[in-house]
Amino acid sequence: MKTQLAFLAITVILMQLFAQTEAGFWGKLWEGVKNAIGKRGLRNVDQIADLFDSGLSDADDLFDSGLSDADAKFMKMFM
């Protein structure tokens, strides 16, 4: 009985340590996904895709697809 109680206590402690470690990892991973897929992240991906899209249709000419100076500086940081 004492062995079972000690085994249970050790198991609970190890599970708590594992859960806290996993929570930190999954939390950081989820935050990165939210930043990449969030409104601003998707908008930036769309603007970058427009830069490399050579076959624009007439409908695309109706919308402003140019980059602002701030966007150009932001992209230069990564190059």
Swiss-Prot record:
GO CC term, one of those recorded: extracellular region
Signal peptide location: 1-23
Propeptide segments, given as residue ranges: 41-79
Any one GO BP annotation for this protein: defense response to bacterium
Protein localization: Secreted; Target cell membrane
Keywords: Amidation, Antibiotic, Antimicrobial, Cleavage on pair of basic residues, Cytolysis, Hemolysis, Membrane, Secreted, Signal, Target cell membrane, Target membrane, Transmembrane
Residues with Isoleucine amide modification: I37
Tissue note: Expressed by the venom gland.
Similarity comment: Belongs to the non-disulfide-bridged peptide (NDBP) superfamily. Short antimicrobial peptide (group 4) family.
Name of the protein in question: Antimicrobial peptide UyCT1
Organism: Urodacus yaschenkoi
The organism's taxonomic lineage, starting at the top: Eukaryota, Metazoa, Ecdysozoa, Arthropoda, Chelicerata
